[in-house]
Amino acid sequence: NQFNGVLVDLACLSFGFKVVPIPLNSTPEHVSYIINHSGISHLFICGKIGKKIWGEVKNSHDIIAIDMSEMNTTSNYAMNWNSFISSSDTVEEFDVDRLLAKVDINDIQTVMYTSGTTANPKGITFDQINIISKRFARALALPDFNSEDIFLAYLPLFHTFGRYFEMLGSIFWGSSYCFAESPAFNSLLNDFKIIKPTIFISIPKRWLQIYEMLQIEMDLFSEDEKIIRKRLQQITGGNLKWGLSAAGFLDPGTFLFFQSKGINLLSGYGMTEATGGITMTPPDNYVHNSVGKALPGINLKLQNDGELCIKGPYVTKAYYKENNDKIFKKGWFHTEDIFEEKNGHYFIIDRKKDIYKNSRGQTIAPQKIENLFQDFDAIKSIFLVGDGKEFNSVLIYPDYENSPV
């Protein structure tokens, strides 16, 4: 995450240039696939990981690569950031009004690729209606967010919450958007003290770490309420009012703890295909184990088997260059997740999909890992588990007849 990257993203979104964020946790093979599949012509690169991956795949792609750092360019890149900015002086007849007039809000504006699956990544398409309508939906669900708020942002900009909720949301609300120095927990603790955010969106792991930090320092069941609240304010900078735990499971007791200490911690259910959130726990109305109620502007229905289907202005219309017949039926997107609904609140029961997310928000594909063990004679069957957990566990049933042990 860096300022120059945000500028590139916003410029492309504003002028109708198709923009494709590439997840930094992609393998070099998947990066090559995304470049070819999406038809990228210009690639903006920053950070050690991005540069390392580009170094491995650059010989396979005839595209213009731009180093977003402001150091001298190297042989790996056509130009660096300063050269790129200076090149604008040579552009003739650049007509802003003409470019804006050509933008069609129904055209594909951005493609976000999935990561962590067994096959090639899927490109999820969004037009400007998808992006803009989601901003109004979030504003209706969170009417108290405003220009006085400060986001401490560390979620990656190739992630829907980092890109749509934090980056575009802060612009919509007129709030301050502050980059975290690093996603590491100790670094975030330092950022809390410096930035003093009012809003913090995170994977469950970080909320749990804050809770455990307090738990180590004091007995949370017997300590005076004022002392606990004061220490929590010291850790989070003193101004934190709102939180969101996204992309994984967080125990209801942890939610209630933060809410009882003055931080309105919210949760929800979402997916990239819906520009992020689909449901959200209403402020001051948390129900145990619920992922909340439907966000404004989206239609939800449950199939006979409980599968959740969604439709609305901020739901993608298609996967890029894919056969969409199985997942889009009569205008409804099938999530492949099983739910129950009680009094408007939704509860996740099971997943039709094989993939799951751990407590760090990382997407895990069990089959891909399980297949790595197929050739071991000593293993008869294997099962990977870890949905919502901090770690993954492999359950192995040995083949006692063929095992040398």
Placement of each model-derived feature along the sequence:
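Conserved AMP-binding/adenylate-forming
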Residues: 1-26, 154
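Conserved AMP-binding/adenylation subdomain of ANL enzymes
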Residues: 132-150, 157-231, 239, 264
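Conserved AMP-binding A3 loop
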Residues: 100, 109-135
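Short hydrophobic alpha-helices that are characteristic scaffold elements of the AMP-binding
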Residues: 9-15, 37, 159, 168-172, ...
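Flexible, low-complexity linker/hinge segments
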Residues: 74-108
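Conserved ATP-binding/catalytic segment of the ANL
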Residues: 294, 298-303, 307-358, 363, ...
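Gly/Ser/Thr-rich phosphate-binding loop
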Residues: 198-202, 210-286, 299, 380
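Structural core segment of the AMP-binding/adenylate-forming
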Residues: 14-86
